[in-house]
Amino acid sequence: MQQPLNYPYPQIYWVDSRASSPWGPPGSVLPCPSSVPGRPGQRRPPPPPPPTLPPPPPPPPLPPLPLPPLKTRRDHNTGLCLLVMFFMVLVALVGLGLGMFQLFHLQKELAELRESTSQKHVASSLEKQIGQLNPPSEKRELRKVAHLTGKPNSRSIPLEWEDTYGIALVSGVKYKKGGLVINDTGMYFVYSKVNFRGQSCNNQPLNHKVYMRNSKYPQDLVLMEGKMMNYCTTGQMWARSSYLGAVFNLTSADHLYVNVSELSLVSFEESKTFFGLYKL
């Protein structure tokens, strides 16, 4: 279909700011002919429409969560190591503190022990110099010792003794029916003294002996014996003493006794007639 030639079209102008036109000043607008040059009666076709832009692409998917930077992980590991080291140092300090406490406690006990040992040494030295004035009662009870004195109403043989009153003493051994009974085997010093006196003198022999009885022996065993003869002057008062003493190895259940030949001539004063022993 042919378009009418007299259809009015707006004129199109090309503008060239860099080229100068011979018909006008530089930068002037040149009219664009509406018809095709060389082809009168035909109009220039309209310019093509601008190209349509494609639709924008969809937004890219969200990227995954990024891993923590290497520096952050290193900082985390460093903090964990520092925490572990702190606890290790704390445990070491606690152990060191406990060790120092135990060492202080041991030093204190050692000082107390040294002080106690020093005091005991000083006390022992003083006891050696001035003697033990007040010995413990336990030591007195454990000491095997006896000192018996004469008994005025003694009328039998062997002699009977006073074991309770006056200066009499019995400890660690037993007094029974005129004799001392040994409870502990060991070495003993045994002694006896008898004082004889008379209004007149007939010079009869005077015997004084200490003997032992034990179920192991069939008869009495004489340990010590003394005999006096010609000890006085006829017709005069007289007094003589007999003393016996020696060390013996005695066993448990041994019984010790004292016998004299003339009981009527014995003076039973506690300072003159006595019988005793003590364990060495």
Curated annotation (Swiss-Prot):
GO molecular function annotations of the record: cytokine activity; tumor necrosis factor receptor binding
Pfam families referenced in this protein's UniProt entry, alphabetically: TNF
Record InterPro entries: FASL, TNF, TNF_CS, TNF_dom, Tumour_necrosis_fac-like_dom
Feature type site, description Cleavage: L80, C81, K128, Q129
Localisation: Cell membrane; Cytoplasmic vesicle lumen; Lysosome lumen
PROSITE patterns tied to this protein: THD_1, THD_2
Topology feature Extracellular, residues: 102-280
Keyword Secreted: yes
Keyword Lyase: no
Stretches assigned to the Cytoplasmic side: 1-80
Signal peptide annotation: none
Keywords carried by this UniProt record: Apoptosis, Cell membrane, Cytokine, Cytoplasmic vesicle, Disulfide bond, Glycoprotein, Lysosome, Membrane, Nucleus, Repressor, Secreted, Signal-anchor, Transcription, Transcription regulation, Transmembrane, Transmembrane helix, Ubl conjugation
Main location per the UniProt record: membrane
Region of interest (Disordered), ranges: 20-71
TM spans (from-to): 81-101
Domain THD: 144-280
Free-text description of this protein's post-translational modifications in UniProt: The soluble form derives from the membrane form by proteolytic processing. The membrane-bound form undergoes two successive intramembrane proteolytic cleavages. The first one is processed by ADAM10 producing an N-terminal fragment, which lacks the receptor-binding extracellular domain. This ADAM10-processed FasL (FasL APL) remnant form is still membrane anchored and further processed by SPPL2A that liberates the FasL intracellular domain (FasL ICD). FasL shedding by ADAM10 is a prerequisite for subsequent intramembrane cleavage by SPPL2A in T-cells. Phosphorylated by FGR on tyrosine residues; this is required for ubiquitination and subsequent internalization.
Top-level division of the source organism's lineage: Eukaryota
A GO cellular component annotation in the UniProt record: lysosomal lumen
Membrane topology according to the record: Single-pass type II membrane protein
Positions annotated as glycosylated: N183, N249, N259
Disulfide cross-links: C201-C232
Similarity-based family: Belongs to the tumor necrosis factor family.
Complexes and interactors: Homotrimer. Interacts with ARHGAP9, BAIAP2L1, BTK, CACNB3, CACNB4, CRK, DLG2, DNMBP, DOCK4, EPS8L3, FGR, FYB1, FYN, HCK, ITK, ITSN2, KALRN, LYN, MACC1, MIA, MPP4, MYO15A, NCF1, NCK1, NCK2, NCKIPSD, OSTF1, PIK3R1, PSTPIP1, RIMBP3C, SAMSN1, SH3GL3, SH3PXD2B, SH3PXD2A, SH3RF2, SKAP2, SNX33, SNX9, SORBS3, SPTA1, SRC, SRGAP1, SRGAP2, SRGAP3, TEC, TJP3 and YES1.
Function: Cytokine that binds to TNFRSF6/FAS, a receptor that transduces the apoptotic signal into cells. Involved in cytotoxic T-cell-mediated apoptosis, natural killer cell-mediated apoptosis and in T-cell development. Initiates fratricidal/suicidal activation-induced cell death (AICD) in antigen-activated T-cells contributing to the termination of immune responses. TNFRSF6/FAS-mediated apoptosis has also a role in the induction of peripheral tolerance. Binds to TNFRSF6B/DcR3, a decoy receptor that blocks apoptosis.
UniProt name for this protein: Tumor necrosis factor ligand superfamily member 6
Protein species of origin: Felis catus
Native organism taxonomy: Eukaryota, Metazoa, Chordata, Craniata, Vertebrata
Gene: FASLG
